[in-house]
């Protein structure tokens, strides 16, 4: 497997030789994990195009893949696979998404069992450009703060809620607030469209800490008055998109991008709605749902 850092980018690497289909031994899996922990975003190229079943199996090597919980927008036979597209055929929307800008977020932050790794594969891309996916390093935001600022942020909790425009397609029994706590072992991977998490997350593999917020799904800091919450969140979220912390991925058909969901936020650039953009996505979650939230003093 060949891993090449993306020239001039603060994060991200291109990977050739990853085994996306077929068997994968423990050593090869650990090589991918190591590259992911180092570069946060991996662009896999030059591999055999996986079937839907193989795509799902590849994602499962990195943790449990929950169902999307969508009544429409997911693959009809594999609800775990989200179809992301701007297509409408015979008056029927294909998948979820559109050609507009999609704001900064990390997938499933509104669930008590949050995402660990994202997998997004390009099936069709706009031929005249646009539709890039942007990734911002939120570990770098935490590490840029003073010790006093870090200690303060460790004391806060944040409410996340699903606010993406397709809430009505979520199965009704999942539309509720669920928070880790007593009886956490009974929480199902797909539970919840609203939850409360600590503001600071910790990667259980590397120990790095990130500021776990987004513009799309973060409602407020529950420990602050609304105006104070908004002021602090706006200040922190101004980090998203800064060039020194952000990689903009221009898609090629067949690209499979794998990224650290705990330590980054991502967004989508707008593109010409007359052109086609079709992707498929799965997300792995942490086996230990409390893993990212172990209480620790700020470094």
Swiss-Prot record:
The keyword RNA-binding does not apply. Binds 1 Fe(2+) ion per subunit. Its EC number is 1.14.11.36. Gene3D superfamilies: Clavaminate synthase-like (3.60.130.10). It catalyses: pentalenolactone D + 2 2-oxoglutarate + 2 O2 = pentalenolactone F + 2 succinate + 2 CO2 + H2O. Activated by ascorbate. 2-oxoglutarate binds at residues 133, 251, 277. Pfam families: TauD. Belongs to the TfdA dioxygenase family. Catalyzes the Fe(2+) and alpha-ketoglutarate-dependent oxidation of pentalenolactone D to pentalenolactone F in the biosynthesis of pentalenolactone antibiotic. Also able to catalyze the oxidation of pentalenolactone D to pentalenolactone E. This is Pentalenolactone F synthase. The lineage of its organism: Bacteria, Bacillati, Actinomycetota, Actinomycetes, Kitasatosporales.
């Amino acid at each position: 497997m060949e891993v090449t850092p993306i020239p001039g980018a603060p994060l991200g690497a291109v990977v050739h030789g990853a085994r996306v289909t077929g068997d994968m031994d423990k050593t090869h899996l650990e090589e991918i994990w190591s590259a992911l922990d180092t570069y946060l975003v991996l662009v896999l190229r030059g591999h055999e195009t996986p079937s839907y079943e193989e795509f799902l199996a590849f994602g499962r090597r990195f943790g449990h893949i929950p169902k999307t919980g969508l009544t429409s927008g997911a693959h009809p036979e594999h609800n775990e696979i989200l179809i992301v597209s701007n297509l409408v055929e015979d008056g029927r929307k294909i998948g979820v998404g559109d050609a507009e800008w999609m704001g900064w977020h990390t997938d499933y932050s509104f669930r008590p069992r949050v995402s660990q790794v994202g997998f997004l594969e390009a099936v069709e891309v706009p031929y005249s450009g646009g539709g890039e996916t942007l990734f911002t390093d939120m570990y770098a935001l935490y590490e840029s703060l003073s010790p006093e600022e870090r200690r303060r942020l460790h004391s806060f909790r944040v409410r996340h809620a699903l606010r993406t425009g397709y809430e009505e397609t979520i199965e009704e029994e999942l539309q509720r607030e669920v928070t880790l706590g007593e009886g956490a072992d009974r929480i199902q991977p797909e539970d919840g469209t609203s939850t409360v998490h600590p503001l600071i997350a910790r990667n259980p593999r590397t120990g790095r800490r990130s500021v776990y917020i987004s513009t799309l799904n973060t409602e407020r800091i529950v420990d602050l008055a609304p105006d104070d919450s908004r002021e602090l969140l706006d200040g922190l979220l101004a980090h998203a998109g800064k060039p020194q912390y952000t990689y903009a991925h221009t898609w090629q058909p067949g690209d499979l991008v794998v990224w650290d969901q705990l330590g980054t936020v991502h967004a989508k650039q707008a593109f010409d709605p007359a052109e086609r953009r079709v992707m498929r996505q799965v997300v792995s979650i942490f086996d230990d749902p409390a893993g990212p939230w172990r209480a620790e003093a700020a470094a």
